[in-house]
């Protein structure tokens, strides 16, 4: 129940007007490692690994401007969702270019039918019987992800995983945020 209340409060905060975001320069590589370290032990039969991680060629590493708490939450929601639906593998990759960055979370589960790609981000949406309260989902996680990335001037996308065959959820946003 506490988790549901937390999800609802987070969603309400992100949905109402413009939340106060404190954009900071963060190391995307470190964030990916942190989320994998936090979540990988929770489901021993699913291997959560880093996929291809490419940083900009400016010798400046994988830094991006983001609100650290919210970007962490978005990545955590996507990885835990992928783990819940994976058969045995989840992969987290990123690309940081000069102007834009992208994170891809792929799994080897059944995937999401293309006909449901847009509505999967709808609050309280569950596509099948595997997405029940018993599986740990409340139907708000992907809605929260979409709102978080919206406030970063980006997009949350879904496609079929080219590498693992299941779903691929992607976050894409500007590497630097516009100053107010």
Protein language model regions, located:
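Short alpha-helical Gxxx[C/S/T] motif in the catalytic ATP-binding
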Residues: 141, 145
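A conserved beta-strand-to-alpha-helix junction within the catalytic ATP-binding
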Residues: 22-37
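Conserved micro-motifs of the catalytic ATP-binding
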Residues: 16-21, 59-66
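Short conserved segment of the HATPase_c
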Residues: 112-124
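Detector for a conserved hydrophobic position within an alpha-helical segment of the HATPase_c
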Residues: 149-150
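Acidic ATP/Mg2+-coordinating residue in the GHKL
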Residues: 107
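Glycine-rich ATP-binding loops of the HATPase_c
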Residues: 153-160
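Short beta-strand/loop element within the Bergerat-fold HATPase_c
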Residues: 89-99
């Amino acid at each position: 129940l506490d988790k549901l209340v937390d999800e609802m409060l987070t969603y309400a905060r992100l949905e109402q007007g413009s939340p106060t975001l404190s954009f900071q320069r963060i190391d995307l590589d470190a964030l990916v490692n942190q989320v994998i370290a936090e979540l990988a032990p929770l489901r021993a039969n699913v291997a959560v690994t880093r996929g291809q991680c490419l940083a900009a060629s400016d010798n400046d590493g994988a830094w991006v401007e983001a609100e650290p708490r919210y970007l962490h939450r978005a990545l955590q929601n996507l990885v835990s969702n992928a783990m819940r639906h994976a058969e045995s593998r989840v992969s987290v990759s990123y690309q940081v270019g000069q102007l834009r960055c992208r994170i891809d979370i792929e799994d080897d589960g059944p995937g999401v039918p293309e006909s449901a790609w847009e509505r999967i981000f709808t609050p309280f949406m569950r596509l099948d019987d595997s997405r029940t309260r018993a599986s740990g989902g409340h139907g708000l996680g992907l809605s929260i992800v979409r709102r978080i990335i919206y406030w970063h001037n980006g997009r949350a996308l879904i496609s079929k995983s080219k590498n693992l065959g299941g779903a691929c959820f992607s976050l894409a946003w500007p590497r630097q945020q516009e100053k107010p």
